[in-house]
Swiss-Prot record:
Binding site for Mg(2+) 1: E96, N561
GO MF term list: ATP binding; magnesium ion binding; phosphoribosylformylglycinamidine synthase activity
Keyword hit for Endoplasmic reticulum: no
Organism the protein comes from: Prochlorococcus marinus subsp. pastoris (strain CCMP1986 / NIES-2087 / MED4)
EC number assigned by the record: 6.3.5.3
Quaternary state and interactors: Monomer. Part of the FGAM synthase complex composed of 1 PurL, 1 PurQ and 2 PurS subunits.
Name of the featured protein: Phosphoribosylformylglycinamidine synthase subunit PurL
């Protein structure tokens, strides 16, 4: 029977606040248990019923995502998604957030974010091969934001570098909405090394439950509940809820677990991440439709005075829970100990569908697995039928409201000064959100494992060579996997539906720009409180947009993460929500990495082309130009025509495979002028561009965003072959897709003309200086 000692005597109302539970939750818990929970059990329900663990606010929305496809082997529900990437190889991938921990303890918060996502990958039987990250901070004119940036980057680089997994790419954006609540999203990829995918469901009644890895301490207690609440001026008091990681133990854990998985003697595996031992045991039992009994006296402890509550809610890092074959138990224990890891039998699989926890010869918790993991409560929200009035008003904005252009100069509404287009381009390149992130990339080891094809920043997507024992396939070539993380949160703020469609489209476009076929996505939905009408409408609209884009582009969702309550309160209780940020992690495949291309120009006199959609809009509404130069965040983001998007990307990939295209780069933040500048900077070559549009404003031509546009260069020697191919393929496009030549690669300058009128004349070294030094100059 359950222990009814002093553990059961506690202030219910105060404890509910601590566990972030409501009175209705408490009544439901009592109903499910048939009695009042003791304090330990209440803590277990607190973490398992948090948004972080059970998606109680978002689950109905996530159910609409497309999750199946010809390449999908494992979708949502397991530790990570798995897809078939050909050549008898399987890719495991997922994205997770560590936002709140990074806000109060940036180094450890970010470091353990890396460690946690790596465990999700190797728990499936895959060797981690790459990490990407998507980061958001407040503007760098505040010392507190600079400190957060330093700490987060240092934490990511420390853990990734020490554990030997390359950090190969990502994105970083800056906006005041993130000042009190930075976002740290980490995506990891792994290559399956076992014949069978290792799943989490417990198997075979009587099988030993083996605890493997680091010791359990008091760090991270209640971390899942902390991650599911808003940040305020007292959040620094929650530092104990932030875990402390050890990448060297993680490295040993990776190698030891992969060795053990290969034997087939591990029946199931679950990492101890959010909610620690509570979540791992409950999910393992529920996924196997069985139960688990745990004896806390057998858990390796860092301290002697730990309570059952602390054992169960600790999120100490580098720990795994395994169900193993009893006859192989001693062999496995010795194998793990050889790696310097703790390996203790702490329980067994039972037929009764309960999680039963004992300590000091007493049962301290006894809960049905369905109550903890399967039948978790869902918060029902009303979704407003129309966009908020303030957005409808912003959507009415048109470019006619901007100052007139006179003598190729325009008045900035930000500082009331007139600037030439050349000066505006330099300003945009110095915007930290657009500028080079080399200050960050230099701190990451991107080359460890020797499979990184492009250095971070050199191409639109990261590209990893897939190889086993250095053997090429029968065609004497290596296949590869491309990955990109993307989200324009300004677009999502102004239109969550269109902005989320654009995030999926851009991530696919970036993968296509290196020559890879987009296959599937993982997503990280970073939003503010779902308890406000606007907050939940943003989340719902974003999910609708992601679903539509994924269906159209045939890139199913294999899993991901939801991070809500990303907002901060100041001393006056004023709430600042983050810009809604649904980060899309796209993966794709390429048959031969030798055919992949990067973003910079390759040869003088190569022809510069652009492909895009006539049906999709391109506009300076919602653009970086409008925000950074005019201090305006307004207008409706351009619409993406998804069928045209598919045509554009397909044509590009086919042209790359035929070796017609030498470089490619998508047109995104900053528009055409910034995209051209980036290609020049990456290659140390110039470009001569002739624009012909007659009826558009010059700033629209230079800085508009959207339109599914991709900039690419064609090798002069391949131009006729390319033209012949274009003639054949253009029959598939219809009237909605255009492909046109706009210039050629030159030596030292970026020259942009419009009907013989010079809009821009800048030396490449000027562009490079602004682009490369913007972030480092903030320190």
């Amino acid at each position: 029977m359950i222990d009814s000692s002093s553990n059961n005597t506690y202030d219910v109302n105060e404890s509910l606040k601590v566990e972030n539970l409501t009175r209705d939750d408490y009544e439901e818990i009592c109903k499910r248990l048939g009695r009042k929970p003791n304090r330990t059990e209440l803590g277990m329900f607190g973490v398992m019923w948090s948004e972080h663990c059970c998606y109680r606010n978002s689950k109905p929305l996530l159910a609409n995502f497309p999750t199946t496809g010809k390449n999908v082997l494992v979708g949502p529900g397991e530790n990570a998604g798995v897809i078939d990437v050909g050549n008898d190889q399987k890719l495991v991938f997922k994205i997770e957030s560590h936002n709140h921990p990074s806000a109060i303890e940036p180094f450890q918060g970010a470091a353990t974010g890396v460690g946690g996502i790596l465990r999700d990958i190797f728990t499936m039987g895959a060797r981690p091969i790459a990490v990407l990250n998507s980061l958001r901070f407040g503007n760098l004119d505040k010392l507190s934001n600079i400190s957060l940036l330093r700490g987060v980057v240092s934490g990511i680089s420390h853990y990734g570098n020490c554990v030997g997994v390359p950090t190969v790419g990502g994105e970083i954006d800056f906006d005041d909405s993130y000042s009190g609540n930075p976002l740290v999203n980490v995506m990891a990829l792994g290559l399956l090394e076992t014949d069978e995918i290792v799943c989490s469901g417990a198997k075979e009644v009587g099988s030993p439950v083996l605890y493997v890895g680091n010791t359990t301490g008091k760090d991270g207690v209640g971390g899942a509940s902390f991650a599911s609440s808003e940040l305020n001026t007292n959040s620094l008091d929650n530092r104990p809820a932030v875990q402390v990681g050890d990448p060297f133990i993680e490295k040993s854990l990776i190698e030891a677990c992969l060795d053990a998985f290969k034997t087939g003697d591990v029946l199931s595996a679950q990492d101890m991440g959010a909610a620690g031992l509570t979540c791992s045991s409950a999910e393992m039992a529920a996924n196997g439709s069985l139960g688990i009994s745990i004896n806390l006296d057998l858990v390796p402890a860092r301290e002697n005075d730990m309570s059952a509550y602390q054992y169960l809610l600790s999120e100490s890092q580098e720990r795994m829970l395994l169900v193993v074959k009893e006859e192989k138990l001693n062999t496995l224990i010795n194998q793990f100990k050889k790696w310097g890891l703790f390996a203790n039998v702490i329980g067994e699989v039972i037929s009764r569908k309960e999680v039963i926890i004992s300590q000091k010869n007493q049962i301290v918790a006894q809960i049905p697995t369905s109550a903890l993991s399967d039948e978790t409560p869902i918060n029902i929200h009303n979704i407003i039928k129309e966009p908020p009035i303030h957005l409808l008003e912003k959507w009415e904005w048109t470019e006619e409201e901007l100052p007139a252009i006179s003598e190729n100069k325009i008045l900035s509404l930000k500082d009331q000064q007139k600037y030439s287009f050349s000066e505006i381009i330099l300003k945009l390149l110095s915007n930290p959100s657009i500028a080079s992130k080399s200050w960050v990339y230099r701190q990451y080891d991107s080359q460890v494992q020797s499979n990184t094809v492009f250095k971070p920043g050199d191409a639109d997507a990261a590209l990893i060579r897939l190889r086993r024992q250095d053997e090429k396939n029968k065609n004497n070539e290596f296949s590869g996997v491309a990955a990109s993380v993307d989200c324009n949160s300004r677009w999502v703020l102004l239109d969550p539906y269109r902005g989320s469609i654009a995030a999926v489209a851009e991530s696919a476009r970036n993968v296509s720009c290196v020559g890879a076929q987009p296959i599937a996505i993982t997503n990280n939905l970073n939003f503010s409180s779902p308890e406000t009408e606007i907050g939940y409408w943003q989340l719902s609209s974003a999910c609708d947009g992601i679903s539509k884009a994924c269906i159209a582009l045939e890139t199913p969702v294999t899993g991901g993460n939801v991070s809500l309550y990303n907002e901060s309160k100041n001393q006056n209780n004023q709430v600042t929500p983050i810009n809604p940020t649904p980060v899309i992690g796209m993966v794709g495949t390429i048959k031969n990495v030798d055919k992949a291309i990067s973003s910079g120009w390759k040869n003088i006199n190569d022809q510069i082309w652009i492909i895009g959609s006539n049906a999709s809009e391109s506009s300076i509404a919602a653009s970086s130009y409008l925000e950074y130069f005019h201090d305006l965040v307004t207008g409706r983001p351009p619409k993406i025509h998804l069928q045209d998007e598919k045509y554009c990307q397909s044509f590009l990939r086919d042209s790359i495979q035929k070796n017609y295209i030498a470089s490619s780069h998508d047109v995104s933040d900053g528009g055409l002028a910034v995209a051209l500048s980036e290609c020049c900077i990456l290659s140390s070559k110039g470009a001569y561009i002739q624009l012909e549009e007659k009826n558009a404003r010059q700033d629209n031509l230079l800085f508009s965003e959207g339109g599914s546009r991709i900039l690419f260069s064609v090798n002069k020697k391949e131009e006729q072959n390319f033209l012949n191919f274009l003639e054949i393929k253009s029959k598939d496009f219809g009237r909605n897709v255009y492909v046109k030549k706009i210039g050629f690669v030159s030596e030292h300058n970026l020259d942009i003309t419009l009907q013989d009128q010079t809009l821009c004349n800048l030396r490449v070294d000027e562009l490079t200086e602004k682009f490369n030094n913007s972030i480092s100059n903030c320190f």
